[in-house]
């Protein structure tokens, strides 16, 4: 009986501390509940599995939203950081958490919405819709997925905002192209930013990475065909100009490297889909562009360079001067609004039966939204693959990206390595690549000059 009396709670007797604590908990729960009920539905679309493909027109003319948690942004990160290195990235994140640069605990206060399009990545708070930041696509150098125990992190390596100063390093930079010496002799290393997001699980992380990979693919393809359009159209209309641009007094010559950098500035990114649990590269991975590039670099990828060089060489040997001019006009019209069907029909008439295989070489330069129609047209006219002797080099291009769980991919969809991935680049490789392409296009212009001289 006495025990029952002891168990009876006397009304009103609650410690002040407990009362405040309970009130705060109830208030937070009520506030969180109100927020969750008031939140709008995300602007999203159905994706085709297993690659989470989305209609390219949506990314070009609309956008798609995904829910994430925003942990923060790290600035003044050395540009040579390998974003697919689990160890390096987690070490930075751990240090940032200790110094309170990044959130230590995941709460509903960090809920955010990431909006993806072919033009930028926008991040807003889930509640209130206030913009956190907006990153243009050409400022994104890489994206990677890293798992840390129960945390699923998606990390974007982006360009440092204007005004950011290079960081000092006592060691030589891992990449000579990214460092310079100050007057005092100290090494100045180019810097970048890391945007750190968290998602619910591995599937959500892979989906976000694959969507960004598609964005990269769209921009890469658009930029590549635009570059081809300008190169051929300019060469066809003014063949003596080639790729060398002279001033009016012909006293100075613009470096061809600058021309290519200006044209290729929008597709110099790498998309590391997953760093996963291991930093070792996939056995099936091929060498790709080094991970030591900053987002501000403007380099034409090796794959794009090879494709351009191959096609320009083929056109030079298979088409006459007049036909090259007609091709340039058709390509220019297609880039300015003509339908893919009209473009294919006109090219078919230009090439004829004996040279219809030339259409295969255009495959890498057809935007994703028109690729299916283009493939159907090739099959209709009896051109089904690119394994012939002439078109061997055209088969290197792959539209499908590797599985996000076992490899990294660069911006053009080719498989790439991770931490120890070997890749040859730097200035010599760049100069050689540009020289090869410029020689081909210059040869194209020279052949047109010779064809145009009356005998």
UniProtKB/Swiss-Prot annotation:
Keywords of the record: Cytoplasm, Developmental protein
Broad class of the protein's primary localization: cytoplasm
Cited CDD domains: HHD_CCM2, PTB_CCM2
Region (Harmonin homology domain): 292-385
Region of interest (Disordered), residue spans: 272-299, 399-432
Any one Gene Ontology cellular component term annotated for this protein: cytoplasm
Domain named PID: residues: 60-247
Biased composition (Low complexity): 278-295
Compartments reported by the entry: Cytoplasm
Taxonomic superkingdom: Eukaryota
Entry keyword annotation includes Cytoplasm: yes
Record comment regarding domains: The C-terminal region constitutes an independently folded domain that has structural similarity with the USH1C (harmonin) N-terminus, despite very low sequence similarity.
Similarity comment: Belongs to the CCM2 family.
Subunit architecture: Part of a complex with MAP2K3, MAP3K3 and RAC1. Binds RAC1 directly and independently of its nucleotide-bound state. Interacts with HEG1 and KRIT1; KRIT1 greatly facilitates the interaction with HEG1.
Protein name (record): Cerebral cavernous malformations protein 2 homolog
Organism, scientific name: Danio rerio (Zebrafish)
């Amino acid at each position: 009986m006495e025990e029952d009396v002891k168990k009876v709670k006397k009304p009103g007797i609650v410690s002040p501390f407990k009362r405040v604590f309970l009130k705060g908990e109830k208030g937070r729960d009520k506030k969180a509940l109100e927020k969750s009920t008031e939140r709008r539905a995300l602007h999203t679309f159905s994706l085709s599995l297993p690659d989470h493909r989305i209609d390219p027109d949506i990314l070009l003319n609309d956008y798609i939203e995904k829910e994430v948690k925003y942990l923060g942004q790290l600035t003044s990160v050395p540009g040579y950081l390998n974003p697919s290195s689990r160890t390096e990235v987690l070490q930075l994140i751990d240090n940032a958490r200790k110094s309170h640069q990044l959130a230590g605990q995941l709460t509903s206060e960090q809920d955010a919405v990431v909006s993806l399009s072919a033009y930028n990545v926008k991040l807003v708070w889930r509640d209130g819709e206030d913009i956190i930041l907006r990153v243009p696509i050409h400022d994104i150098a890489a994206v990677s997925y890293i798992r840390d125990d129960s945390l699923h992190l998606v990390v974007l390596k982006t360009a440092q905002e204007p005004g950011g100063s290079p960081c000092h390093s006592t060691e030589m930079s891992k990449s000579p192209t990214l460092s310079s010496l100050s007057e005092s002799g100290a090494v100045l290393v180019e810097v970048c930013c890391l945007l750190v997001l968290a998602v619910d699980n591995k599937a959500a992380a892979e989906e976000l990475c694959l969507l960004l990979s598609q964005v990269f693919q769209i921009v890469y393809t658009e930029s590549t065909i635009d570059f081809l359009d300008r190169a051929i159209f300019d060469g066809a209309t003014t063949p003596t100009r080639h790729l060398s641009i002279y001033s009016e007094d012909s006293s100075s010559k613009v470096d061809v490297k600058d021309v290519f950098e200006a044209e290729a500035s929008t597709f110099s990114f790498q998309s590391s889909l997953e760093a996963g649990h291991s930093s070792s590269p996939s056995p099936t991975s091929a060498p790709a562009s080094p991970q030591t590039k900053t987002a501000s670099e403007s380099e034409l990828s090796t794959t794009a360079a090879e494709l351009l060089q191959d096609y320009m060489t083929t056109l030079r040997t298979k088409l006459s001067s007049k036909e090259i001019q007609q091709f340039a006009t058709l390509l220019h019209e297609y880039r300015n609004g003509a339908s893919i069907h009209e473009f294919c029909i006109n090219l078919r008439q230009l090439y004829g039966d004996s040279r219809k295989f030339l259409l295969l070489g255009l495959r890498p330069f057809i935007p994703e939204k028109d690729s299916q129609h283009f493939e159907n047209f090739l099959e209709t006219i009896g051109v089904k693959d690119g394994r012939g002797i002439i078109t061997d080099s055209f088969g290197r291009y792959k539209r499908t990206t590797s599985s996000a769980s076992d490899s990294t991919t660069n911006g053009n969809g080719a498989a790439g390595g991770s931490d120890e991935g070997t890749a040859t680049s730097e200035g010599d490789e760049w100069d050689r690549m540009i020289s090869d392409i410029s020689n081909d296009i210059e040869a194209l212009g020279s052949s047109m000059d010779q064809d145009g001289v009356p005998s």
